[in-house]
Amino acid sequence: KYGIINVHSSLLPKYRGASPIHSAILNGDTETGVSIMYIEEGLDSGDVILREYCEITEDDTLGTLHDKLKELGANGLTKALKLIENGEVQAEKQDDSKATLVKPITKEQAKIDWNNTKEVIYNQIRGLNPFPSAHTSNEKGENIKIYKSEKIEKKYEDEIENGTIVEIINKKGPVVKVANGGLLILEAKFEGKKLQKGVDIINGRKMVIGEKLLYSDSSLK
């Protein structure tokens, strides 16, 4: 009689599919939300009962945004059920021409390519935190998961390869050279070790100037 409804963590028809929260951060979006929709045969293509909107801040991670949307989804679902109960639903057909489809996150997407810009890598790190987490490796072959970073607006010498530790910021952490500046590592986890702050990484000399971080081929662990 009433149909089956669902909560989807994006502003449909954008980001239909398996990884809408990751994708919003990876793409540097500043707004997302939830859609309360009717389920039909197509993937996330049913009529939308209502949308609830949410800002994505520069500091949001997959984890924090997931929690915001969970709350928003619960509120939206309550409103939608009330509309259905009162016979006040004015569902909106989705514009399929504006639909984007997102697949599950792959292991490949979690590897950091230091030839990318600081913005791309910064979004990759927060968009995959806490899981599967963006990762790199060092010249010793250790896999390193990076959980938090900060963009550094600075020009480093062209001769220095991207992925090289170019600077140590006192009481903060190591800076890695990328395509258009640097990225300060604030939280990372070495294979088999616990999560460390950037300051502890430099104090323990786990990363030193001149060391190279690589596009990791090791499997996620």
Predicted regions mapped to residue ranges:
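Donor/substrate-binding cores of folate-linked one-carbon enzymes
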Residues: 1-104, 108
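Active-site loop ensemble at the mouth of alpha/beta enzyme cores that anchors a bound cofactor
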Residues: 102-104, 109-112, 117-120
